[in-house]
Structure formats: C-alpha cells, structure tokens
Amino acid sequence: MKRGKKYQESVKLVDKTKLYDPVEAMELVQKTAKAKFDETVEAHIRLGVDSRHADQQVRGAVVLPHGTGKKVRVLVFAKGEKATEAEKAGADYVGAEELVSKIQNENWFEFDVVVATPDMMGVVGRLGKVLGPKGLMPNPKAGTVTMDVAKAIADIKAGKIEYRLDKTNIIHCPIGKVSFGTEKLVDNFRTLMSAIIKAKPAAAKGQYLKSVVVTSTMGPGIKVNPLRVSE
C-alpha cells in the first residue's frame, strides 16, 4: 500500500531501531500526527502468552484518568427499577427484548458499549453471534454484567475501556487524542500498562511484555521500551 507524502515525512521522524521511553514516545506521536482531524492515539501490546489456552487469557477493564476523548454511547439491557436507574445515570439506550429484536432485525449498532443486569443475560445471549465478534458482549470481568448499572455507566462515560487479547496475542487500546498533550497521554498509557501487568496470568512463562507500540490514527508506529512502560 502506497503511503502519502505526510506519512513519509512522519516516518523520517521515527528511529525504527530505538525503544523510546513513554514520555519521548508521546511527544513523538504528536509530532507525527499530520492529519487535519484530532487523531486517536492507540497502544498495541504484544504479550508472551498463548490466547488459545483458557488459563492464559488476558482481559479486563480500566478507567483512564483522562478518558479517551470519544463520546461513548451506552446501551443497557435492564427492566423495572434497574432500567429507570440506567436512564437516570445517562445511558443512551435502555430496554430488553425489544432492543434484541431491533439489533437482530435491523442490523442496528449505534452504540459502543453494552451493559446488562445478570437476569437479562439469557435474553442478551441470543445476540452472542452478532455482539461477540464486535467485542460488544457484556462480560462480568469487564464490569459490564452487573446490578450496579449506575456505576457501570458512570465509569464508562468517565473513560473506562476494555482490553482483551486478539488471536495474535496483541491488545489494541485507544489511550486518548493527540490534542490531550504529552502529560495526559502518558498518564493514560501508564494506567493501561499497569492494569495489563497486574492481569498477567499465572500460567504465562518467559517475557510477558513482548513489544509495545504507540501510534496515531494515520501516523507511524513508535516502539516503547517494555521495561520502562511504568516510568
């Protein structure tokens, strides 16, 4: 794939042989973001685990101190008092079977996160084949299957993100916008990395953090020293 002139200019700013510390990396990710929109900054973390084994899964959620810069639309599956609680807490969509039908029949996906009360999981389970591949299925580990829907919504709106391994043992997560500046991006990055390090499975052997790369939406990858991610 041929890259544009701006991308080629950005690539020249990055030393491909160097492992940057987090502060240097965040400064560089801003310099290499040349798009006319406020690019998202992403972290890509390759782990020394095997996601094919159940005891080597890495999955969880963390509240980024400065959020992601993105307005997150929350759908809540709940009934009765819990539905009212969700509406008061600022959920964008609240419902039960009628929302399942809407998703199934209209291919409707105008939401970013799904929360459900435990009693609704039998209903939500019917959407497993469509929500699962999109990473939208509610999950207790991520705090999205809960009776405390108000807290779940507040955390998500405040910048809570879910992290999980893909099939190639890499975690991909947004950590903010280029406009955040170095300090906020570093704060968010360190918070994410601390959560991933704490989530290390007991069955994982050898080096846990294989590689860490940060990039803006349209920018080149910048390698971060795995030994310095908490600094």
UniProtKB/Swiss-Prot annotation:
Entry's Gene Ontology molecular function annotations: rRNA binding; structural constituent of ribosome; tRNA binding
Biological process terms in GO annotation: regulation of translation; translation
N-terminal signal peptide: none
Family annotation (InterPro entries): Ribosom_uL1_bac-type, Ribosomal_uL1, Ribosomal_uL1-like, Ribosomal_uL1/biogenesis, Ribosomal_uL1_3-a/b-sand, Ribosomal_uL1_CS
Keywords: Repressor, Ribonucleoprotein, Ribosomal protein, RNA-binding, rRNA-binding, Translation regulation, tRNA-binding
Disulphide connectivity of cysteines: none
Keyword rRNA-binding: yes
Entry GO terms, CC: large ribosomal subunit
Keyword hit for Cell wall biogenesis/degradation: no
A Pfam family the protein falls into: Ribosomal_L1
NCBIfam families (alphabetical): rplA_bact (TIGR01169)
Similarity remark: Belongs to the universal ribosomal protein uL1 family.
Chain's role: Binds directly to 23S rRNA. The L1 stalk is quite mobile in the ribosome, and is involved in E site tRNA release.
Assembly: Part of the 50S ribosomal subunit.
Protein name: Large ribosomal subunit protein uL1
Gene name of the encoded protein: rplA
